[in-house]
Each structure stands twice: as C-alpha cells, then as structure tokens.
UniProtKB/Swiss-Prot annotation:
Record-given protein name: Phosphopantetheine adenylyltransferase
Site (Transition state stabilizer): H17
Positions contributing to ATP binding: T9, F10, H17, G88, M89, R90, E98, W123, S124, Y125, V126, S127, S128, T129
Transferase as UniProt keyword: yes
Keyword tags: ATP-binding, Coenzyme A biosynthesis, Cytoplasm, Magnesium, Nucleotide-binding, Nucleotidyltransferase, Transferase
Subcellular location(s) per record: Cytoplasm
CDD domains in UniProt: PPAT (cd02163)
Source organism: Actinobacillus succinogenes (strain ATCC 55618 / DSM 22257 / CCUG 43843 / 130Z)
Obligatory cofactor(s): Mg(2+)
InterPro entries, per the entry: Cyt_trans-like, PPAT, Rossmann-like_a/b/a_fold
Length: 161
C-alpha cells in the first residue's frame, strides 16, 4: 500500500495544513502526518501537544495517522516505508526552499520523491508563524485554526492570564 508522509513542525496545525492533509487523503490510501520536534524553533506547544492537536484535527480522516519524530525526516521515511513526501506550497517564495529540501531528502532517503501540493487560495496566506504572531498579540485566530487548536490556545491564554 502506498503511504505518503506530510512533515512539519505544525506549531500549531492550521486550516491550511488541514486542507493539504484532506486533499492528500483523497489521493493516497495512507497518509502519515509527521510532527517534527524542531527544538531549535522554540515551539509554542511541545511535541506531545502538537501531536495530540494534529490527531484531534484529523480524527475525521480514517486513512490519516499522526506520528511525532525527532532527527532527520529521511529516517522517518525509511522507518515507515514511505512512497513520497508531501509538501504544501503557498507562494513562489516557498518554492526555492522546498526545492532544496526535496533534493536533500531525495539524496538522504535513497530516491523518495517530494510532491508539491499548492495551497488553495483560501489558505495561501496562512502559516503557523502568522497564527502565533496574531495569538501572541491577543488577536483572534479562530478562522485560521481547527477547533482543537483554538481550544488549546484559549486554555493557554487563560492559564497565562
């Protein structure tokens, strides 16, 4: 069975990510959402929380599962017998970076290809970074994130108050 992987930090997972996951789940029989530890990015949510939020956000998709990983994506690709790496692209600004990653991952994973899926217009401007910025400045992010993330952000805001 063909299994693809959609990696990211997902800090937090957004409706843009969810759109890519839902569209990928229609195209492939098995999708793994791989949440990267990314300790150098100083995430808002720890890895365990990001995995849980991703799981809750994709619970309606029976052919999607979520894993957390640290280290190289190529190692997760080998471990899970991945057919292709899915990458979402919002704008041409993403292209150069994603192309470099695709070449690097092809070398490190012995030939596994990266497939680029363009964002829909509705979500082309949404990123986790923008969501965090809006949240940290007490803005409203409910139109940009799935309900589990919104609930977690609201709980976090109340705890910080």
């Amino acid at each position: 069975m063909k299994t693809v992987i959609y990696p990211g930090t997902f800090d937090p997972i957004t409706n843009g990510h969810l759109d890519i996951i839902e569209r990928t789940a229609v195209l492939f029989p098995q999708v793994i959402v791989a949440v990267a530890a990314s300790p150098t990015k100083k995430p808002l949510f720890d890895l365990q929380d990001r995995v849980q939020l991703a799981e809750e956000s994709v619970a309606h998709l029976p052919n999607v599962r979520v894993i957390g990983f640290s280290g190289l994506l190529a190692d997760a690709v080998k471990e899970h017998d991945i057919t292709a790496i899915i990458r979402g692209m919002r704008t041409t600004m993403d292209f150069e970076y994603e192309l470099q990653l695709a070449h690097l991952n092809r070398v490190l994973s012995q030939g596994v290809e990266s497939l680029f899926l363009p964002s829909t217009e509705q979500w082309s401007y949404v990123s986790s970074t923008i969501v965090r910025e809006i949240y940290l400045h007490n803005g409203n992010v409910d139109q940009f994130v799935p309900p589990p993330v919104l609930n977690a952000l609201n709980r976090r805001r109340k705890a910080d108050a």
